[in-house]
Amino acid sequence: MSRELITKYPQIEDYSTIWMENITHTTAKGSSEFGLSNTNKLIRQYEYATGLKTGSTSGAKFCLSATARKDGVNMIAVVMAEPDSKTRIKDAIAMLNYGFGKCSIYQDEKALEKIVYAEVKHGMQEKAKGETLEGFRYVDTSGSDLSAVEKEVQIQKQTAPVKKGDQIGEVIYRLNEKTIGSVPVYATEGVGE
């Protein structure tokens, strides 16, 4: 549920990281101001914390769905049925630190460093220009040296007509000769017959 919330509604972070806020309550009898503080003490105690939600009842005890971001990696730690608030924070920090210690991320914001072209047979032009619409991200948990990631641009020959937006190739990423992902290359212009 936490992953869905932060993925679909990233603006939740703007609210869940507020430590303390003064609220003005206005009624027919007038207005009064009161301070509202966040029950998620993690946001004050852990430098990478980005939120999210605490809860406690006599049956469920102390629970926390904690989110944090470090070096471009987002983590979620969920602790339930803790005996007290301090323990839930301590255990969430331990889980987040463990996750950050095990994960590293490879990012290639610009999959193509130069303009690429696909050959077009029977077209009004001989080539179709291509580009990627997104970068590439890979999360590694094996401890591999991510500086060893290699990428290869593969562009396929096309037969006219080629429509703008047609996939004409891909950028393939490999680590230790194993494919770890790819990014499609799309035609940025159409080529008629």
Go through the PLM ranges and name each one.
Residues 2-193:
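Domain-terminus/edge residues, biased toward the C-terminal soluble/receptor-binding domains
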